[in-house]
């Protein structure tokens, strides 16, 4: 698959993720749209394959971070927020053991 196709896929994926993460928040949706478009336009004339790969890695990391770490909060009352988690954020509660296992 060509590099231009991969860049376009990343661009579309970032916009889809933006729409899911900031659903019903017009201000955040618009700010994210502007930032995504701005960053892609800024690097539009980049020709170095190494630099393009580096930029794509950053874009992929941003998409993953948005999808797995950002939670939406809605103001319900004065000093009160209602958190709206998405399915991507919900993980199983796995027991954690901070003691290392002994090798035998």
Curated annotation (Swiss-Prot):
InterPro entries for this protein: Complex1_LYR_dom, Complex1_LYR_LYRM7, MZM1/LYRM7
Subcellular location: Mitochondrion matrix
Protein known as: Complex III assembly factor LYRM7
A Gene Ontology molecular function term of the record: protein folding chaperone
Record's GO cellular component terms: mitochondrial matrix; mitochondrial membrane
Keyword field: Chaperone, Mitochondrion, Phosphoprotein
Phosphoserine modification, residue list: 60
Biological process annotations from GO: cellular respiration; mitochondrial respiratory chain complex III assembly
Function: Assembly factor required for Rieske Fe-S protein UQCRFS1 incorporation into the cytochrome b-c1 (CIII) complex. Functions as a chaperone, binding to this subunit within the mitochondrial matrix and stabilizing it prior to its translocation and insertion into the late CIII dimeric intermediate within the mitochondrial inner membrane.
Entry similarity comment: Belongs to the complex I LYR family.
Quaternary structure note: Interacts with UQCRFS1.
Gene: LYRM7
Organism: Pongo abelii
């Amino acid at each position: 698959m060509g590099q231009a196709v991969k860049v376009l896929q990343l661009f579309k994926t970032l916009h889809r993720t933006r729409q899911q993460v900031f659903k019903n928040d017009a201000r955040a949706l618009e700010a994210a749209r502007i930032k995504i478009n701005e960053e892609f336009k800024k690097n539009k004339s980049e020709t170095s394959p190494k630099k393009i790969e580096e930029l794509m890695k950053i874009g992929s990391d941003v998409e993953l971070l948005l999808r797995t770490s950002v939670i939406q909060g809605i103001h319900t009352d004065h000093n009160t927020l209602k958190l709206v988690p998405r399915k991507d954020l919900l993980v199983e509660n796995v027991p954690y053991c901070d003691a290392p296992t002994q090798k035998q």
